[in-house]
């Protein structure tokens, strides 16, 4: 559905940045007000990322007003906060389709708009990309400006400081806007974030650099920022920060909700040479009281009525796999104080809220720093502690070298609880868990498990927790569990052993993960045998050998990339056994899977029971 734009009369005049720049500056405050209201109504009617965008309305307006986008390059980090940017860059009438199949992408996406100069989804990439573009702009000598916008949460990632260190050394013209809202998806931790908060709480003192003198000219008095400062700030000050040591000219902090102050500051900063950092203070969820009070809970929302000031109540039902993990974690921690669990800033999403509250001394949020999180777990394991790393499949990619070099190579008993394995849906290509089985299967010493249901998940987690001969990984999907009974008593499974769930004829279906129910449904129609393989590595070669000798065709099913996945492991094992049987691999194709509702994507990829049956029948008829 589209909105009656006449309800937003000033915003209606600014469908693109070019339109916006034609407006007088005194209208920008009204543009911001209407933009926030439009965003509120739009997300309420379609679902999506919410609180972050409410906090960047004035920043978005100021950036597109001052900079000549898309000629000037604007790079958003992660992209949760870029909904206002999408609205202001010609996509206003399509916002109701965001995150839906064939609709607008959930994040800035190069294929979607010339204003989206860099495709994003993972955090910490903006400064590196901006530096690359700044170097290119310098070589082109066309006067192009480059701006990166990054939140305080993403600033906890090491890649950001690698880029800033390089940028300071090269001294290319670029601006980094630090959007400090004291909140990423989960509460930020660490000395850096404490330092950012202290910038506004203590008495700031320093000398003002020549560049800052230019910025101060004509600047209004910055409004008092309640609860966060001891004094009125006039213009900006330059504290001796880490940013200065890295070679950046630091300016700020300033009120990120004062659009006029932002415009004047950015206008002056355009002419400054070298790398600049503008520190702005914003409030996540700005303008909508429930989101201001609970920015984590309102980070992403389903459809809701903004006038009700609450999200729709969730119906009681099956637990999610994340909740299954969280309960298991609490159950084991209650018996073992040597269990230490780590998350890279995904406490809520990984089901660890209760654990963090009940066992705070055993809980560690490593912030958005996946490499550090994995090696931190390795350090725990070296000293005899039971390390558990709760991490999304897509984010484990960022800690791959650490998984190999710091954990598997040393055969350290670290358990990886890998959430969001397979199709995740609305967040799209950057977040699908499509590759983990493929990139883990080649790592020596690593045991890999994929549960078919919540009880297997619980028992596999316990199996990994008890296993001491090396690292283990339990890989489970996003979303609700299957409804299987969870047995409270935990029993370690025999390593590398699967089970036959149905005995049939001619066709043997080897299932890996939560597609088991679909495999059994298909088997009933084909009178096929079905094995719940449980272990991707080590593969149950004895069971495979038996099934291969007793059947004419082997079918493997997994919600992972076919290339290099569990099915590839089956073919490799059959080759080693010198058994030549036709094998149909069913899984994710060799492409990046786009966004949409999980059920829609699964059906399109023919991974539901109907699609699996059709693939097998087509294979048999060839």
UniProtKB/Swiss-Prot annotation:
Oligomeric form and interacting partners: Homodimer.
The encoding gene: dxs
Gene3D superfamilies: 3.40.50.920, 3.40.50.970
Pfam families associated with the record: DXP_synthase_N (PF13292), Transket_pyr (PF02779), Transketolase_C (PF02780)
Molecular function as annotated in GO: 1-deoxy-D-xylulose-5-phosphate synthase activity; magnesium ion binding; thiamine pyrophosphate binding
GO CC annotations, alphabetized: cytosol
One GO term (biological process): isopentenyl diphosphate biosynthetic process, methylerythritol 4-phosphate pathway
HAMAP family for the chain: DXP_synth (MF_00315)
Cofactor binding annotation: Binds 1 Mg(2+) ion per subunit.
Protein name: 1-deoxy-D-xylulose-5-phosphate synthase
Known role: Catalyzes the acyloin condensation reaction between C atoms 2 and 3 of pyruvate and glyceraldehyde 3-phosphate to yield 1-deoxy-D-xylulose-5-phosphate (DXP).
InterPro entries on file: Dxylulose-5-P_synthase (IPR005477), THDP-binding (IPR029061), Transketo_C/PFOR_II (IPR009014), Transketolase-like_Pyr-bd (IPR005475), Transketolase_BS (IPR020826), Transketolase_C (IPR033248), Transketolase_CS (IPR049557)
PANTHER family: 1-D-DEOXYXYLULOSE 5-PHOSPHATE SYNTHASE-RELATED, 1-DEOXY-D-XYLULOSE-5-PHOSPHATE SYNTHASE, CHLOROPLASTIC
Family: Belongs to the transketolase family. DXPS subfamily.
Keywords carried by this UniProt record: Isoprene biosynthesis, Magnesium, Metal-binding, Thiamine biosynthesis, Thiamine pyrophosphate, Transferase
Enzyme class, broadest EC rank: transferase
Pathway: Metabolic intermediate biosynthesis; 1-deoxy-D-xylulose 5-phosphate biosynthesis; 1-deoxy-D-xylulose 5-phosphate from D-glyceraldehyde 3-phosphate and pyruvate: step 1/1
Cofactor: Mg(2+); thiamine diphosphate
EC number: 2.2.1.7
UniProt: thiamine diphosphate binding residues: 80, 121-123, 153-154, 181, 288, 370
Residues that bind Mg(2+): 152, 181
Catalytic activity of the protein: D-glyceraldehyde 3-phosphate + pyruvate + H(+) = 1-deoxy-D-xylulose 5-phosphate + CO2
